[in-house]
Amino acid sequence: MRTLLLSACAAAFVNLAHGQAVVQPPKTWTTCAACHAAQGAASIGPPLASVVGRKAGSSPGFGYSRAMKNAQITWDDKSLAAFLSDPQQAVPGNRMPFAGVTDPGEVAELVKYLKTLR
């Protein structure tokens, strides 16, 4: 019975269509989701699927600011954390109207979540 219960719990966290673990977004994601889609087309902001490893300002179909297009950043843990903490300091002149996430734990959770978006 114990094995059955553990198996059922594990199955609840697996996306069977893709064979990947389903990761719940952190609470702070709701702020991001007001402008960004996790999957699909650009909205007010660019979609964030596969953002990790992507060059800043390069998602097709989104009109980035000159500052973001010219930023010499490839998004990784460190650059995402810096940008999420203070977007204007990380990329001066970008158009994201967001002051940043002040809690380092929340920033870490957002970066962890962004790494799951494919």
Which residues make up each language-model segment?
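Short, basic/glycine-rich phosphate-binding loops at helix/coil junctions
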Residues: 8, 61-63, 91
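Boundary at the C-terminal end of the N-terminal hydrophobic targeting segment
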Residues: 10, 14-21
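Positively charged n-region of N-terminal signal peptides that target proteins for export
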Residues: 1-4
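Sequence/structural segment immediately N-terminal to covalent heme-attachment motifs in c-type
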Residues: 20-43, 48
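Alpha-helix boundary/capping residues
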Residues: 11, 32, 55, 87, ...
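C-terminal capping alpha-helices of c-type cytochrome domains
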Residues: 76-118
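Gly/Gly-Pro-rich "capping" loops immediately C-terminal to redox-active cysteine motifs
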Residues: 37-76
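Generic anion/oxyanion-binding catalytic loop in active/binding sites
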Residues: 24, 69, 96-99
